Amino acid sequence: SIPRETVESYFGTTPEAIAEANTRKNLIGSAKAGALGFNAHAANTVAAAFLATGQDIAQVVEGSNAITTAEVRDGGPASDGDLYASLTIASLEVGTVGGGTKLPTQAEALDVVGVRGGGDPPGANADALAELIATAALAGELSLLGALASNHLASAHEELGR
């Protein structure tokens, strides 16, 4: 979980506001839109990571079918009011050997994060790559939810002309 003070100082908003933004945007909004995934933009992170590491780009659809949750924890003095967020990805199919992972730039990207090759035991590097992608996707979800909850998203787009 993320301490309340960290949420307030880093995101400029409260855990309650982020949890509310998640409910409205990711859960209710996605349901109304008929989406299969209930997340803000996991596909952006998954697609970028897949391209960079030589994954099968066609698997972005499955890899971004994710559910983001956010709730305020009231678990006593140690975690009172902290934000708990998670991202559940049902099927994140990655590999660290063969196919596009042999391309020079993609192999270098796998080297940079220390997951090129099968790993020990075999498959350990693929597991680690999946964890890295999921962690990055959760960070992206929190960033967007924080921007929505603090009303910074629109002003950032106006400032950057996007």
Residue spans for each PLM region:
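Internal helix-turn-beta structural module
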Residues: 84-162
